[in-house]
Every structure is written in structure tokens, then in C-alpha cells.
A protein has these predicted regions:
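Hydrophobic beta-strand scaffold residues
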Residues: 26, 46, 89, 113-115, ...
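Short beta-strand and adjoining strand-loop segment in the mid-core
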Residues: 27, 128-152, 188-196
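Rossmann-fold NAD(P)-binding glycine/threonine-rich loop
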Residues: 85-88, 92-141
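NAD(P)-dependent Rossmann-like dehydrogenase/reductase catalytic/cofactor-binding core
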Residues: 2-8, 17, 149, 156-189, ...
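Beta-loop-alpha module in the N-terminal Rossmann-like domain of NAD(P)-dependent dehydrogenases
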Residues: 51, 63-79, 96-99
Length: 338
């Protein structure tokens, strides 16, 4: 099957490579000519512009966008004048599901199909495959099934869920048509919110282990320092690298994210290459908003998001104000760091 890919970053480029390896024909475009040339060497057909890309596609055209969420509307606006009834636009990035609903409505008068795909797999997807959560009209999704099947990881060696043989479907192959437009990105949005929470749990747990030697450290004796009453209970010098590794082997918290944690700690146990400023790309915020609208309590996911804000210094003013209030209330002098 033929597919166009716009956006040849880490994920887009590797998705093209996986599709070519699976026997599909890919036409590619990116703002970087080098990115296009690199994939042309891997047997993709390069395009010099969006117009050139559309001209090289057979009808009905299938065009996959793998661009930042902020660039999707502009890219669609540039493409639409060159597309025709029956063509399919796929947004495989991390767009807000509300925008998917709007875009599908705007494209409907031109009979251009819009499909949203929440794509998980990151830089590992070339070899492992991509988990895909899909939203859009049934006919368009069915037409794209050969693409999804190639990109997906397949059943692999994951044991089948008991009773799954009676259900069937594509979910156990790693891709799922979740529902109408927006459903794919809605499910991916919550997936990423959960990811925030899991990552935060590992980070907090490892931080406790790292401070299990606090009893060996000298603590200031003053009104601003909480005394450690039983320092003899905190005398452990724990090897986080090895703990992460042993947890990978049969523990109930084993996961791919723990695998990556173990890899990071093996490369650099002190994590000296990281400052601890954790970004968020929007999905966590949207997840919390959906939870508020539906009156669903999500304390773990919301706390994980707020901690990302705090890591970037977003709480600095509030923390300063807390110190100011403590000083005015009781004359508490702020301690210096270190």
C-alpha cells in the first residue's frame, strides 16, 4: 500500500522505515531536505513540497501527518486545496482530541476523511512496533488496516489474556479502532496521563532509596530543621542500579518504563547529565481537564502533572511567598541551600 508521511522526526522517519521494510511504498516530505534525502536512501520517494507529494500519490490518497500539534492546522490548510473527495488525512501526533472533532467537521464538506491516531512506541518503535489508538470513520480505518498492521508490534511473545480467544479483534496485535473522530487521541491522552503517574511513582520511590543513608549525615540543630530522632534506622547505602535491575526480574512493578529506568541508572548512576527540569507536552493537562469535566477524581495523575510544573521552577514565587509568610508569622529565617 502507498502512504505519504509528512514530518520525518525521530518517530516519523522510523515509521517510514518500518513500513518500507513491510513492503509498503512511502512518499515523504519534511522541512529539512536532509531528512528527506536520508529516507530516499532507504527507498522512500522524496517530495520537494506538499504539492509535489500529493502529485506522487495514487488515489485515494493517504497522507499521514507526524508533526507537532501546533503545526497540524497549518499543514492541513496547506494540503486541503490539493486533496480530493475520498482522500484520507491521518494525524499520528499528540493532538488534542477536541481539535480532531473540529477538523473532521471542517473536512466533511469536501468528503476528505480524517483519522486520528494516538501513537505510542517512541524511538523504539522501529524494532518493537507502535501501539496505536485510532479514531475515525469505519471505512477509512478499514482502508488503512494494512498500514496499521505493519506498524503495530503484533501479538509477539506476550501471553494471551485468558478468555481473549473468544473476543478476537486487533487489540492484541497492538492497534485498536477506539471509536469516532477524537477517540484515538482521547485514549492516547489518558495513556500519557497514566505514564506521568507511573514515571512519578518510580522517581519518588527511587528518591526515597537514595536517601536511605540520611542517618549518616550531620543535621543542623536549630529551629528550622526537623530533627531525625532515629538516625540509626537510616544507615543504608543502597545501589539503585542493582535495585532497578532486580525489580525487573519477576517483581509486580516490572514494566518497560522500569527497564528504561534501569538502563539510565546503569549508564549514569548519579544522573549527572540531567538537571531535573521535566517538560509536559499537553496530554497530562488535557487528561486532568477531562477528569474535571467528568467529575472523576485523579489525585495521582494531577499530582504527577503538578510536580512537572514544580520541577521547572513554576512554583518558585509561591515558595518564596511561603518563606515570607513564615518570617512574618514567627520570625523564621529562610535557610540557604546546601
Amino acid at each position: 500500500m502507498q502512504l505519504a508521511m509528512i514530518g520525518l522526526g525521530r518517530m516519523g522517519a522510523n515509521m517510514v522505515r518500518r513500513l518500507i521494510k513491510g513492503g509498503h511504498a512511502c512518499v515523504v516530505f519534511d522541512m529539512s531536505p536532509k531528512a528527506v534525502a536520508d529516507l530516499a536512501r532507504d527507498k522512500a520517494v522524496g517530495a520537494a513540497s506538499l504539492v509535489d507529494l500529493v502529485r506522487k500519490l495514487e488515489k485515494p490518497r493517504a497522507v499521514w501527518l507526524m508533526v507537532p500539534a501546533a503545526a497540524v492546522d497549518k499543514t492541513i490548510a496547506d494540503l486541503v486545496p490539493h486533496l480530493e473527495s475520498g482522500d484520507i488525512l491521518i494525524d499520528g501526533g499528540n493532538s488534542y482530541y477536541v481539535d480532531d472533532i473540529r477538523r473532521a467537521h471542517e473536512l466533511a464538506p469536501k468528503a476528505i476523511n480524517y483519522v486520528d491516531v494516538g501513537t505510542s512506541g517512541g524511538v523504539w518503535g522501529l524494532e518493537r512496533g507502535y501501539c496505536m489508538m485510532i479514531g475515525g470513520p469505519d471505512a477509512a480505518v478499514r482502508h488503512l488496516d494494512p498500514i496499521f498492521k505493519t506498524l503495530a508490534p503484533g501479538a509477539g511473545n506476550i501471553p494471551r489474556t485468558p478468555g481473549r480467544e473468544r473476543i478476537g479483534g486487533t487489540a492484541e496485535l497492538g492497534y485498536l479502532h477506539c471509536g469516532a473522530n477524537g477517540a484515538g487521541h482521547f485514549v492516547k491522552m489518558v495513556h500519557n496521563g497514566i505514564e506521568y503517574g507511573i514515571m512519578a511513582a518510580y522517581a519518588e520511590g527511587m528518591s526515597i532509596l537514595r536517601h536511605a543513608n540520611v542517618g549518616e549525615q550531620q543535621r543542623a540543630i536549630d529551629a528550622e530543621t526537623t530533627p531525625l530522632r532515629n538516625p540509626e534506622l537510616y544507615q543504608y547505602e543502597l545501589n539503585l542500579r542493582d535495585i532497578a535491575e532486580v525489580w525487573r526480574r519477576g517483581s509486580v512493578i516490572a514494566s518497560w518504563l522500569l527497564d528504561l529506568t534501569a538502563t539510565a541508572l546503569t549508564k549514569d548512576p548519579a544522573l549527572t547529565n540531567f538537571a531535573g527540569r521535566v517538560s509536559d507536552s499537553g496530554e497530562g493537562r488535557w487528561t486532568i481537564k477531562a477528569a474535571i469535566d467528568a467529575a472523576v477524581p485523579v489525585p495521582v495523575l494531577s499530582t504527577a502533572l503538578y510536580e512537572r510544573f514544580s520541577s521547572r521552577g513554576e512554583a518558585t514565587f509561591g515558595d518564596k511567598l511561603l518563606s515570607a509568610m513564615r518570617y512574618d508569622v514567627g520570625g523564621h529565617v529562610e535557610k540557604t541551600a546546601g
